[in-house]
Regions:
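Sequence-structural signature of mature extracellular/luminal beta-sheet repeat domains
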Residues: 1-217
Length: 217
């Protein structure tokens, strides 16, 4: 599945690249998208959640579709109050089906039920650009935009990198520092993933590379 920013749509592909479904087109009403950032699919029923919009976008919400692409509801609205969103940049589901939203411009993760109820707000993972949750509820958060107290970065006083913790209680227990932590150009990993061996991958947009961090025994 692809979230196409300029086309303002979500496209579902087969493993062979065949287009199977296209969700919506440009707009800001309840069923249309504007600059979608991320997509997550519930493996239990195939429901699709789309985060929008990117910088300057007007929607700032999560749009929920069923597996056939039919609109169900929206979650959130523009703002900084609990339950509101500013540039929701990433999505993930934990083992209980809770929806984690990387609310990047608000420097927090917000956790919702799939019915749209706000369950929790976490700020201890920095400025979240990317989220990944393993089957055992280990949470990986890519922070590409933070920086030291020198003024580098959008969220100052903490370092950019990948924070690792618990999706159950929010405890942070590990940190992978960015390779160039003092660069002031949003150059950290924006996407994050983990393979079956526990190795961590960071997608670094500005430097156009993929980092691989090997799990030590």
């Amino acid at each position: 599945r692809s979230n196409e920013v300029l086309g303002n749509q979500v496209i579902k592909f087969s493993p062979d690249g065949e287009i199977l479904m296209t969700l919506t087109h440009a707009g800001s009403d309840s069923e249309r998208l504007h600059w979608p950032n991320d997509v997550v699919v519930d493996p239990s029923d195939g429901d699709v959640f789309v985060a929008e919009s990117h910088r300057g976008g007007r929607n700032n919400r999560i749009v929920h579709f069923d597996r056939q692409g039919r609109f169900i509801k929206t979650i959130g609205s523009a703002g900084s109050a609990p339950g509101q969103l500013r540039e929701p940049h990433s999505l993930a589901l934990d083992s209980r089906g809770r929806l984690f939203v990387g609310d990047r411009e608000n420097n927090r993760i917000q956790i919702f039920s799939q019915s749209g109820e706000l369950l929790d707000v976490w700020t201890q993972f920095g400025r979240p650009s990317g989220l990944f949750i393993t089957q055992d509820d280990r949470l990986y958060v890519a922070d590409s935009e933070s920086g030291p107290d020198t003024g580098a970065g959008e969220l100052t006083g903490i370092m950019k990198g990948i924070r690792i913790g618990s999706a159950i209680d929010g405890t942070v227990h590990s940190f992978i520092e960015d390779l160039e932590p003092l660069r002031d150009d949003h150059s950290g990993a924006e996407g994050v993933g983990v393979d079956s061996a526990g190795n961590v991958y960071g997608a670094v947009v500005r430097r156009r590379m993929l980092e691989r961090h090997v799990l030590r025994p």
